[in-house]
């Protein structure tokens, strides 16, 4: 969110942030406030820039409950299981298959990263940000092909590009 639309290149922590949404702007503002607090008061912090969180607790002990699901992985799986049509935004993105490319990172890896970030901040006088991704990007089309591999054929409805959706966010 803080990088905005980086074009077709991998995001690096040293890239200049250019948020294109209020959400991205608010994340960047918090990073800047944390850096100011470190300078003024010696309070260390670590900002974690996730890409796309996905997955669930393998023990099924904890989870999340949303009134309206917005994430592609559970939406696609639910559509396949219920025989509903899945809407995909495609064909105009400048990527190999015309769909958005994202880096999905498992929620358990994110939980582990949070613990490591807390330890790092408690052991160092610092205010840093780190990208958190899997390093294995997938396009929306590839993601849907994987869902279909395990659930069977899906009904897919193709829509045009979604405004403000970067083509490549890795």
Regions found by a protein language model. Name each.
Residues 2-52, 59-71:
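Catalytic helix-loop patch of NAD(P)-dependent Rossmann-fold dehydrogenases
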Residues 68-81:
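C-terminal helical subdomain
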Residues 3-4, 9, 57, 83, ...:
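A short secondary-structure junction motif
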Residues 78-170:
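C-terminal substrate-binding subdomain of Rossmann-fold SDR/epimerase-dehydratase oxidoreductases
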Residues 47, 73, 111-114:
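Alpha-helical structural signal
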Residues 1, 46, 84-88:
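Short coil-to-beta-strand
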Residues 53-54, 93:
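Hydrophobic pocket-lining residues within nucleotide cofactor-binding pockets
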Residues 3, 54, 136-138:
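Feature marks short, surface-exposed loop/turn motifs that line or immediately flank catalytic pockets
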């Amino acid at each position: 969110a803080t990088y905005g639309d980086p074009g077709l290149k991998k995001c690096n922590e040293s890239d200049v942030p250019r948020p294109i949404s209020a959400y991205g702007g608010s994340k960047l503002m918090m990073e800047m406030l944390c850096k100011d607090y470190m300078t003024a008061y010696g309070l260390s912090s670590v900002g974690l820039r996730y890409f796309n969180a996905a997955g669930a607790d393998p023990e099924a002990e904890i989870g999340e409950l949303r009134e309206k699901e917005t994430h592609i992985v559970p939406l696609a799986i639910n559509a396949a299981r219920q025989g509903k049509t899945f809407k995909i935004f495609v064909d105009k993105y400048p990527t190999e298959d015309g769909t958005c490319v994202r880096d999905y990172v498992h929620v358990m890896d994110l939980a582990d990263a949070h613990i490591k970030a807390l330890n790092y901040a408690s052991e160092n006088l610092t205010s840093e940000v780190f990208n958190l991704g899997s390093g294995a990007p997938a396009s929306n089309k590839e993601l849907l092909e994987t869902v279909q591999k395990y659930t069977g054929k899906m009904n897919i409805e193709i829509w045009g590009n979604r405004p403000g959706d970067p083509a490549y966010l890795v």
